[in-house]
Amino acid sequence: MPVIALDRDRIRSIKVEYNLTEHCNYGCDQCSHLSPYMAKRESSLESFKRDLAALSEVIRFYRFRFVGGEPLLNRELLAHITAVRASGIAEEIQVCTNGALLDRTPEEVFAAIDTLTISWYPDPHCDQAKIDRAIEICRRVGTKVGVLKIDKFRRMQVARPIEDKSLVKDIYDTCEIAHTWYCQTFYEGRFYLCSRPLFTGPYLSKIGIEAPDFRALDGIPLHEPRLKERLAEALRSKKPLAACRYCLGTVGRNEPWRQLPAAERKAPPRPASSLAEMLDRRRLRFRKLLPLPPLRSLLLFAPQGAIGRAAAMFSTSLKRD
């Protein structure tokens, strides 16, 4: 479970992320948000503001992270950033991008955020010139920037539910996405420990498999009484999500990065690999032996006014994710 701190009025956590789009201009195989298979959809600014207002009453984060899909595809990106800044819900705002649209991004977007993270894949749509331009603008406006070269993804999605309950629990307990990287999110009135409940159902439906409504099963309603207590309980829960039965967390085997062809995105085949072939047992054993909270969790126990200064100690880690 992610490390959190409780004040009298609010929960304190490290990070929350928000999917500005479900679709993407890339089609990465093994995308953790299953973006190649999602319909074109941008965040509703009205729904976002409503959920943001509810959350800001009960929780504070060090960082608010915009993801996707590809967040630079959202035409109201700047309005979303402005809403987060006005809410006071986080000390820093981050945008994570594949970099392909950096040359079209207005300078005011770079200036409005605190950190830009570029996931640089071996694809010609993002080149050194685009990255150099982004770095130069970020330096000029005082925004931190991190460039991560990525040439492999881990297997995550399985087509059939994992029946071994102890294995599901082990995968959940060792999941860095939920517990170490603080990839909590919210969407249309519900809060989630990670994004898998949002996207697993639509993917399974696309390959012809009927699945439960993970969005309802795994989401915490944001507009009902006792939100602070219910959020704290969910964040401290040791029980796997319903969607965890269809996920390998961060212990799937690595696969070389590749772009899926359009035909495969439109009509994806069911995965042919067995669970044994997809699961990295060695990594699972290692993660079980090393269930340590991330160093950035120490930020939660710094005095409120010192959090920003203390965060500089962990800037490399925070730029990474």
What are these regions (language model features)?
Residues 12-17, 158-164, 225-236:
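Short, intrinsically disordered, charge-biased short linear motifs at domain edges
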Residues 1-95, 101-104, 267, 274-279:
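Conserved alpha-helical substructure of the radical SAM core
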Residues 74-197, 202:
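Conserved AdoMet/S-adenosylmethionine-binding subsite of the radical SAM
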